Amino acid sequence: MMEIRPAEISDILKQQIATFDTPVDIAETGTILSVGDGIARVYGLQNVQAGEMVEFPGSGQRGMALNLENDNVGVVIFGDDADMREGDTVSRTGAVVEVPTGKALLGRVVDGLGNPIDGKGPLVGDVVMKRADVKAPGIMPRQSVGEPMQTGIKAIDALVPIGRGQRELIIGDRQTGKTAILIDTIVAQKSVNALGDDKKSLYCIYVAIGQKRSTVAQLVRTLEETGAMEYSIVVAATASDPAPMQYLAPYAACAMGEYFRDNGMHALIVYDDLSKQAVAYRQMSLLLRRPPGREAYPGDVFYLHSRLLERAAKMSDEYGAGSLTALPVIETQAGDVSAYIPTNVISITDGQVFLETDLFYRGIRPAVNVGGSVSRVGSAAQIKAMKQVAGKIKLELAQYREMAAFSQFASDLDPATQKQLARGARLVELLKQPETSPLAVEEQVCVLFAGTRGFIDAVPVDKVSSYERQLLAELHTGGKEILESIRTERQITKDNETRLTDFLTSFGRQFAG
């Protein structure tokens, strides 16, 4: 046995004391009282904030504190609660729910918390973490909407124009082409994004809430095939994801859009659809034992959507002049727009595009009900050339619908009425458009000019679509300078009008021959 001299003992003790360091980890923890249906009741966590992220070390899951009560905290779980047990530990993170934002997300598919789910590995590039649920900009940092956001769809750009920074509701029954309008709008931004100018580009964010995974996969494939995925982000909280993820996904995606808005860029966010977010929120609220209101929705379901949609804005020049445009979708039951959630969202947004089942089945696609659709921004969101041709269309279509209803009962019609009916039928045909074939604004102007100035009056109704196709092909070969002039001058000048009239006259003879 080694002998230690008394003189050395004090040295050894000093060395031991000098190296003695026990790491202490101080964390506020709580205990699960009960868990089930994606909700955990937690005892403890006295200082937790509302909306704070909490961790369940035992199962590796995370959750968000929503109900702060006297003796416990109601936590919604962002995952499967199967591995959680009564008595398990819960710890605070001290941070409110944050999501990654920035250009690194472009071209990626992420979940409601911003984690990539497309199998392409982690996010690469500059990522900025932002709070998912933030206050909307006030009154002074905003300016009125005055810059067009081209959807590439004639019926919308001409009749219910949407501006950058606007909130336009897409509302209709299931299977009426709501998602098709959203995809077309995203695809239509390809030409403006190809310019590579951040002040003009429009980055797109598609939020899938409560949809089938196969539907989301098909949508991503469509965006990839059309080359639109490179300037888009897809945020997916599918039907198999827990209700808290479906509730959070729109806010997380909105934070991603706000990154572009607040850095002087432009973004478009589409929520498909907010009816399912309201259902997920209702489920969470009822399980948290919050008092139910109309249709069993909680009392703050209006605030759920208003605080989300108010974050879409056109910022003033002092704040970078960026914008975030929102296209929320609401699914109606049997065309009932007077139900609770539809009326809420209609009152929050700056107008709505109303899609009708009857029109869809009659082959009028996009099935836009022109009478029921409105844009509260109006012609401020159109270039002058579009105003010049679109002004008459709405009136002519309204008169046509009225005449068509009366003409069913009348046997002999005067020539003026017959002419109006003929023109209206051709305009309805002209506003039809196949999926994923958006038109540039100058192409739309030329087509609508032909419709409103009587150049298609002699064309048989069933030949209108082929007339349009051939006209566009002809314009791209023999009328390039007309298109270029409308694109750069953004109006139909006297000189342009003469050239376009001559072009359409000669094309009409060629088409008839």
Curated annotation (Swiss-Prot):
- Tell me what topology the record assigns in the membrane: Peripheral membrane protein
What name appears for this protein in its UniProt entry? ATP synthase subunit alpha
* PROSITE patterns to which the protein is assigned, alphabetical: ATPASE_ALPHA_BETA
Superkingdom field: Bacteria
Listed GO MF terms? ADP binding; ATP binding; proton-transporting ATP synthase activity, rotational mechanism
- Assign the protein's first listed, main location to one coarse class: membrane
Subunit arrangement?
Answer: F-type ATPases have 2 components, CF(1) - the catalytic core - and CF(0) - the membrane proton channel. CF(1) has five subunits: alpha(3), beta(3), gamma(1), delta(1), epsilon(1). CF(0) has three main subunits: a(1), b(2) and c(9-12). The alpha and beta chains form an alternating ring which encloses part of the gamma chain. CF(1) is attached to CF(0) by a central stalk formed by the gamma and epsilon chains, while a peripheral stalk is formed by the delta and b chains.
Describe the reaction catalysed, as an equation: ATP + H2O + 4 H(+)(in) = ADP + phosphate + 5 H(+)(out)
Enzyme's top EC category: translocase
Checking PANTHER family in the record gives: ATP SYNTHASE SUBUNIT ALPHA, MITOCHONDRIAL
The record's family statement is:
Belongs to the ATPase alpha/beta chains family.
Q: Name one Pfam family in it.
A: ATP-synt_ab
Where does this one sit in the cell?
Answer: Cell inner membrane
- Keywords for this protein: ATP synthesis, ATP-binding, Cell inner membrane, Cell membrane, CF(1), Hydrogen ion transport, Ion transport, Membrane, Nucleotide-binding, Translocase, Transport
Query: According to UniProt, where does the site described as Required for activity lie?
Result: S373
Q: Which InterPro entries match?
A: ATP_synth_asu-like_sf, ATP_synth_asu_C, ATP_synth_asu_C_sf, ATP_synth_F1_a_nt-bd_dom, ATP_synth_F1_asu, ATPase_a/bsu_AS, ATPase_F1/V1/A1_a/bsu_N, ATPase_F1/V1/A1_a/bsu_N_sf
Which function does this protein serve?
Answer: Produces ATP from ADP in the presence of a proton gradient across the membrane. The alpha chain is a regulatory subunit.
State whether keyword ATP-binding applies: yes
Q: What is its EC number?
A: 7.1.2.2
